[in-house]
Amino acid sequence: MNRIAVIGVGNVGMAFAYAAAIKRLANDIVLIDANAARAEGESMDLADAMALVGPVQIRSGGYEQCEGARIVVVTAGAKQMPGQSRLDLVRVNAGITRDILTAVMQYADDPLYIMATNPVDVLTHVARTVTGVAPGRVIGSGTVLDSARFRGHVAEILGVDVRGVHAHIVGEHGDSEVALWSRANVSGIPVAEMCARRGIAYDAAFREKALGHVRHAAYEIIGRKGATGYGIGMSLCRIVEAILHDEHSVLTVSCPVAGHYGLGDVSLSLPCVIGSDGIEEVLDAPIAEDEQAALAASARVLGEHLAAL
C-alpha cells in the first residue's frame, strides 16, 4: 500500500491531494490539519470525487495517521500575503515546521519528506536538521514550478511545444533565483540560436524580461486571487510521481548543496535525479561565470536567513 500523508489542507495541500488522487499515485491519502473539521470536510469532498475515478482511499485524522506513510508532504504554514517576500515568513514558518516534523516522527518510520511551505529552501534545510534523515530524503519543491514557468515562457516566445524546451531555474525559490541561459535549449538547439532563427534579439533585456516573468508570477497571482495553488500542487505531484514510479527524472528541487559549485551549507535548487529513494544525484553541469556568481549570491541570501533563525 502506498500511503501519502498531506500536512496542511489549504490551497496548496488540497491542489496536491486532488492531483495525486486523480493520477492515482497512492491508494491511501491522509489529510492532516490543525483545523480537524476542515480536514475532515476536505477528505469527504475529495472522497466523493474518487467515486468517479477509482479506488483511492481519502481520509483525515491526526498525526498518528502518518504511521506507514511512504511520503509526507508538508504544506502547512503561515500564508504569504500580497507584497510579502517568501523570506519574510522565515521565523514563523520555521517554528511551525519544527512542530509538525516532531509530531510526524513519533509515528512515521523513515518516510520521504516533501517540503512546500515557504520560504521552502530555508525550511527544507530546517527539516533536514530536525529529522536527521539522509540528505536525499528531504526534498523541497524548490524551483520545479519556476522552471516550468521558464520553459513555458520561452516556448511561447519561440513558438514551440514546451515539451521540447529544456531550461532550468536554480537557486532560491524566490527573488534571487537564477536562470541558466547557458544550458537552455530547444531539443538541443541553444535558445540563443533559436532566437536568431526567428529574428528575436537575444540580449540582456530579453533575458531580464523572461526572468522577471518567472520571478513575479507568484506575486501577480497572489495579488489577484490571494494565493497560489494549482501550479505548486502539480509541481509537488510531479516530484511524488517521480519517486513512486522510480523514474530517475531530473527536477530542480531544493536540497543541501554544500560542495556543489563551491556553495556553503544551505539548501537551494539544482537539477537533481529523483527516484524511489528521493534525491539520487545532484547534477552540477558547467555553467557560465555570471550564472555561477548569481548562484553564489542566492546562496548567501539563504545563508543569512538561516543564520537569523
UniProtKB/Swiss-Prot annotation:
Positions bound to beta-D-fructose 1,6-bisphosphate: R151, H166
Pfam annotation, one family: Ldh_1_N
Regulation: Allosterically activated by fructose 1,6-bisphosphate (FBP).
Pathway involvement of the protein, from the record: Fermentation; pyruvate fermentation to lactate; (S)-lactate from pyruvate: step 1/1
Residues reported in the UniProt entry to bind substrate: Q80, R86, N118, P119, V120, D121, D146, S147, A148, R149, T228
CDD domains reported for this sequence: LDH_2
Keywords: Allosteric enzyme, Cytoplasm, NAD, Oxidoreductase, Phosphoprotein
EC number assigned by the record: 1.1.1.27
Residues with Phosphotyrosine modification: Y219
Domain of life, per lineage: Bacteria
Active site (catalytic residues): H173 (proton acceptor)
Enzyme class: oxidoreductase
Catalytic activity, reaction form: (S)-lactate + NAD(+) = pyruvate + NADH + H(+)
Major site of localization recorded for this protein: cytoplasm
Annotated localization: Cytoplasm
GO biological processes: glycolytic process; lactate metabolic process
Oligomeric and partner information: Homotetramer.
HAMAP family: Lactate_dehydrog (MF_00488)
Family membership: Belongs to the LDH/MDH superfamily. LDH family.
Protein name: L-lactate dehydrogenase
